[in-house]
């Protein structure tokens, strides 16, 4: 029998309370007929002042008996999206991952691209299998868009560090739906799966996006200057200046050589540092 809520599975939907029962509230699609099918919202999730006819924003999924169920808890993943999820158990037929709901998400063995270990985090995509069940997959490359439609330069987006290429940079899962690149020249200390806010720095002719963890230079320089000064004031900081290697600058400050020079220029203007005869930057005594 076809699930009347299949088109809502894995999505957040605006639903309407039609009636109450011992188990909870029965919801139907807003504007549907009085005889329309309903799905259950468990009693513990019903707002205290809820009445028939009230609208509720809920996520629709299947319970352990494959019955459609509504929840006001928003999971970490919705249909067609990709996010890093933690493996909670491994069985002979697949692995279960924590996606924020009591019923964990199954990633069948056939959809795993590597052996999974309990506690590990991997990018998982959510889709409907041929039996209409919400299922996880590790085959996420084809689910992620590479064209940045809807994004603008200098817009801030949410992302998770995905794959690292020493020559190119870090590929980032952006807004759980797209792939962006944090170029190798951008300083960072991101671990795989680490979430961060990224700024879209460039949209290439082919629609791909380049990212940065930093604000535009004119906005970032104040924070960088404060950070550079704090590092220079630490005991044991080695001499550093304009002729220092980019690697040393990045190791000490987590900044590119260009950003470091901008910060030093700002500090010189403020009189917070001075240059030695050898060209090293030295913090003024406080």
Roles of regions detected by a PLM:
Residues 1-286:
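Single-stranded RNA-binding regions, centering on S1/OB-family and related RNA-binding modules
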